[in-house]
Amino acid sequence: MLRRFILDRSGNFGIMTALLVVPLLGAAGTAIDFGSALSLRTELYAAADAAAVGSITPKSDAATQANTMSGDGSLTLGKSEAQKIFFSQTSKKQGDVPVTVDISVQKKAGILSSTVSFNATMPTTFMQVMGFHQITVSGTATAQYETPSYMDFFMLLDNTPSMGVGATPDDITAMKKATANGHDKGKDKNCAFACHIVSEKGVEDKNSYYNVARNNGVTIRIDVVAAAVKALMAKAKDTQSMASQFRVAAYTFGKTAQDAKAAKLFKVSDLDYNLGAVAVATDMINLMSIPSQNYYNDQQTSFDEALKGIDTEIKGNAGMGTSNADRQKIVFFVADGVADSYKPAGCTSPKGVNGGRCIEPIDTSNCQKLKDRGIKVAVLYTTYLPLPDNDFYNDWVKPFETKIAAKMEECATPGFYFAVSPTDGIEEAMEALFLKIVSAPRITS
């Protein structure tokens, strides 16, 4: 009888259906529950991504807090903002699902990092018949944002009489032509330099070659430097990621030769966020005046004293540039590379001194002192123009002419050097050097 029951095929469909209905319903229920869990996971990941990214954007609370920190650390404002963003991204239908969120927002070496981890426990519906009462959904989203480099530029501009030379070969030719007859009984004929004579009482000599240049439309080198600095302020304003990223101060070697003798820099502009105001101030960048020809034996170009002066102007630490409170200090030095100063000891000229007067390529020891402080030194070398028909040039400059550019490059922080010839544009060169500086990788250790 048992054998007949086993071999009997009638009613098998009903029996098999009864046997399979529970696993079939369980499988279908599992698919539905897992589908809901997958939907929840997708939504929570999207919320975590939004929170991780949104909490460290340039205008986020975390970025604002990081901007005030001179060092590294946790950004509590970023954590609060990330939490708000996360829960604002979840839908109401998921509101009954308990979700825990762990958030970390940190600043380290100028990089803001956020980590948003979530863990949710979703109750099941159909899977409960199989003994599974909940599904755990978890995940982590991370994001990073490198803050812009905050920089303070201290522009040190050589405005000494040698910067009164014609800006281009054509300007030099025009200047020589304009001075072909010389002055004061034929002295200083065919002069390429526009000396600016203003007496110690402030009375300007209208016949000085500075005014000859002006009256004949001759552009001198300091004019081009001043125009380049003004244009650079517009470029810097367009380049910065935020209004506070760059500050600029500008100095010349002195308004007068008397200032230079006293080692007193002329401050064109205080260190300022307002780059437009700095641009306006560039109108005060003029050729240094001298009270008379051969005043102080023409010893107005002391790179040593100018670099010492700018070193004194730069207060506090050199900075890493990671925040507004940790701004990187940069000297932007523009000069033609030939010093002419009273330096009876330590002159590097191969000809030595002449009665205490030292004409030499730049002595880089004061550049090194700035670099030893951690201050970056950017050098724009406005190539010294050879004047083969000038006795002073042939006697005192030509012996070290081949070293001028090399010494200027030695003064600069590696990679922060640019040379511009008389036929090149100083404005373009200054902009190129600036962009090179602001795009350089930030060293964090």
Q: Can you annotate each of these PLM segments?
A:
Residues 2-4, 10, 32-445:
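P/S/T/G-enriched low-complexity
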Residues 21-35:
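Short, strongly hydrophobic transmembrane alpha-helices
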